[in-house]
Amino acid sequence: INSGKEVGAQIVLPEMTDVRVREAARELISMDFDILNIEDFQDNLDIYLDFLNKLPFTDNWPADNLREFLNDPLHFAMAMVACDDADCLVAGAVNSSSEVIRSVIRMIGIRPTSNQVSSIFFMISPDGNSAFTFADCAVIPEPDSKQLAAIGAESAEFHHFLTGDEPLVAFLSFSTKGSASHYRVDRLRDAVEL
């Protein structure tokens, strides 16, 4: 949290119709975060339309379709991030995980060194002294060993980026110290060796 405040991170919350998001916005503002209002960026619509028009998935879209697409607050907020008008966005209270992920892949893209998209839950202890990263809880239901290794490495990297702490990585399964023989346990064992 302090890292975000120190760099002056600008956050856009595209789902302000949800009471929980409005409460979160108030809390973030009370913590001195800069919460951007989508309405304040309507003058940039032409910039966002031009950006959107250059993306592969909008090939041959008429101007009306581009405008309609950006009428969705999630897509508009993604354009804000992609065009460097916001540092990050938080979504998923109103839109499904798949809608958010699809929009990220289409409009922002994934890191060139990554072969997949995965998710994390970043949890801060009630006293604020500890942070935990849990992955992948929502995107890849049956990752293979290579995917598990990549998820672990990228999650550890993200944890370090957010906290500055050296992460300790654990792969969890239903087997206690190798008590079970199962292909799901074998995948975890193989991932650790990678």
Residue ranges and their predicted role:
Residues 1-34, 40-194:
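Anion-binding alpha/beta catalytic cores of soluble intermediary-metabolism enzymes, centered on
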